[in-house]
Every structure is written in structure tokens, then in C-alpha cells.
């Protein structure tokens, strides 16, 4: 494990599950992981890390294939990536000596959080979700006002997609910037950080590393679209969802079946955010996260 301090951020690296994981770590106290989505990397939590670190040990990793974490390539079959990511989290926590922890997650990271909570519920103090996929969405991806929003999920699976998007700085800026603008409550909210996103995704392997997620998740997504919402045992650790109402791709109305998949959950919807609540409304997000984990860790110690 080694540490690099850059612009006030504590960057660390550790080996876990056969790969080198990069993460930013601040604070002390009970541990919480911040798991990002796509098109994101650890830096999407830059407005959250310091406030949360006032009370918690905050760990924001780059997921396998993203950011500065190692990119071992597209697995064969691609679906294996999903299991690898869950195994990464467990091995990563073990490497850090953490037995029980909270998880904040969004988008892709929320798949990892849900799958881990099903596999190892005793290690999860609580789950805090921003807009995310869950099984209850079912066939609703194919509704007329939704199917036009998910074209990128097919595009990202094409073998030439990373080469096309990464062919130049402007093409990368245009593609990644589209989602940061279109999915947010207000266009331009990411303007001050857009070049950081472009820098990140132009690093070798980072575009394909993110696109691999869509190769990995396509079979299960197709099953949901054709067969509908599957029956599954409910996730047991306490969960709180903070959902941005303006999200065009993961709609707030789709939260209506959360109770079928989570045994103990609360839902809060904000009209002043889209897909990226943690970045768009950081004060709201930070307050909700702090309150939730102060409660769940306290109750877990009883």
C-alpha cells in the first residue's frame, strides 16, 4: 500500500483480488465506501469526501476498469466482470482490515452494492443509493419514452466504440459531456470539471474499461426486458435511496417496486437533481448520508 498526496487528495493503492486498486481515503471513524457509476470515476465524489470525512473513514475507489485502478481486460465471458467487481469489494475490504462498513453507491456501483449485500449481508452496516438500476425496473426500459434514452448501452458494446470516442479530445468531450449535461437537472453543472472527466477517459484503457460494463450487463438487461422483473429474496441491510427526479434514464417513478427487493428501506426524491444527485446537490446528499450512517452504525452496535 502506498500513498500519493495530490492537490489535497490522499491517493492510495492496494492489491486485492489480483488487481491494483486505486482509491482516495480521508477521515477516521466507521468506514464507508463510495462507489461510482458510469461515466464516472472516484472524482465524482469530490464534493462529498471532505464533509463525510469529518465523521467517517471515507474510501472512494475506482472500480475495476475505471480511473487509475488496474484494467486486466475484458473477461471471457464478459458477464464475469459483474462477479469480479463484487469479489473486488470483498477482497479490498479484507486488504484494508475492514470487517463491517457502509456503502454509498450510484449507477454501476449500485449493482456492486446490491450484489455484495445479497452475498455478505453481515458485513454491510447500511446501503445508501443514488439513482440506480434494481430488478424492479423490469420491462420498463422498453417504454416509448425510455427506449430512446438507452441507445448508448448498445453503442458502448461495439468493438470500435472506444476507438471512435477516444479518437480525439473533442470527440471524447462531446460524448462524455453529453451524458453529464443531459442526465443532470441543469446543463452546465459539470462545466468546471469537464476537462478532468476528459483527461480521465482519455487515459489508456479507461473508455474500454467503462464500456466493458455494458458488455457484462447486457445479458441480464435483456432478460429483464423480455421476462420482466425477477423474483428475488429481499436485501436485508437497511437502505436509503435519494433519487433525482429529473433523471431521464433512471426515472423516479420506477422506484415503486423497491419494497419487493429491499426489506428495510426509505426513499427520498428531490426535484432539484437529475442522475447525479451527489454531484448536483452535494449539501443535500452529504446531510442525508451523515444522518443515515450515524443511525445505522449506532443501531448496529446495540
Regions found by a protein language model. Give the residues of each.
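Conserved alpha/beta-hydrolase "nucleophile elbow" surrounding the catalytic nucleophile
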Residues: 36-38, 105-106
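Recognition helices and adjacent regulatory flanks at domain boundaries
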Residues: 44, 63-66
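A short, Lys/Arg-enriched amphipathic alpha-helix followed by its capping loop at the start of a domain
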Residues: 48-56, 95
Amino acid at each position: 500500500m502506498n500513498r500519493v498526496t495530490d492537490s489535497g487528495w490522499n491517493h492510495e493503492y492496494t492489491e486485492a483480488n489480483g488487481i491494483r486498486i486505486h482509491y482516495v481515503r480521508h477521515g477516521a471513524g466507521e468506514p464507508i465506501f463510495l462507489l461510482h457509476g458510469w461515466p464516472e470515476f472516484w472524482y465524482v465524489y469530490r464534493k462529498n469526501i471532505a464533509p463525510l470525512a469529518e465523521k467517517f473513514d471515507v474510501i472512494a475507489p475506482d472500480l475495476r476498469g475505471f480511473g487509475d485502478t488496474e484494467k486486466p481486460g475484458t473477461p471471457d465471458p464478459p458477464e464475469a466482470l459483474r462477479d469480479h467487481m463484487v469479489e473486488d469489494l470483498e477482497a479490498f475490504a479484507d486488504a484494508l482490515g475492514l470487517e463491517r462498513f457502509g456503502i454509498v453507491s450510484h449507477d454501476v456501483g449500485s449493482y456492486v452494492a446490491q450484489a455484495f449485500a445479497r452475498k455478505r449481508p453481515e458485513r454491510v452496516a447500511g446501503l445508501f443509493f443514488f439513482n440506480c438500476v434494481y430488478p424492479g425496473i423490469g420491462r420498463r426500459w422498453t417504454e416509448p419514452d425510455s427506449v430512446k434514452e438507452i441507445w448508448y448501452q448498445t453503442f458502448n458494446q461495439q468493438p470500435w466504440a472506444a476507438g471512435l470516442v477516444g479518437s480525439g479530445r473533442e470527440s471524447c468531450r462531446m460524448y462524455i459531456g453529453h451524458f453529464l449535461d443531459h442526465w443532470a437537472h441543469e446543463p452546465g453543472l459539470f462545466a468546471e470539471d469537464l476537462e478532468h472527466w476528459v483527461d480521465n477517459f482519455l487515459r489508456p484503457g479507461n473508455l474500454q474499461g467503462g464500456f466493458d460494463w455494458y458488455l457484462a450487463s447486457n445479458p441480464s438487461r435483456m432478460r429483464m426486458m423480455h421476462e420482466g422483473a425477477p423474483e428475488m429474496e429481499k436485501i436485508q441491510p437497511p437502505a436509503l435511496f435519494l433519487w433525482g427526479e429529473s433523471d431521464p434514464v433512471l426515472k423516479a417513478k420506477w422506484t415503486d417496486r423497491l419494497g419487493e427487493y429491499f426489506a428495510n428501506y426509505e426513499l427520498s426524491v428531490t426535484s432539484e437533481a437529475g442522475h447525479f444527485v451527489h454531484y448536483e446537490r452535494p449539501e443535500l446528499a452529504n446531510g442525508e448520508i451523515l444522518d443515515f450512517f450515524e443511525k445505522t452504525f449506532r443501531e448496529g452496535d446495540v
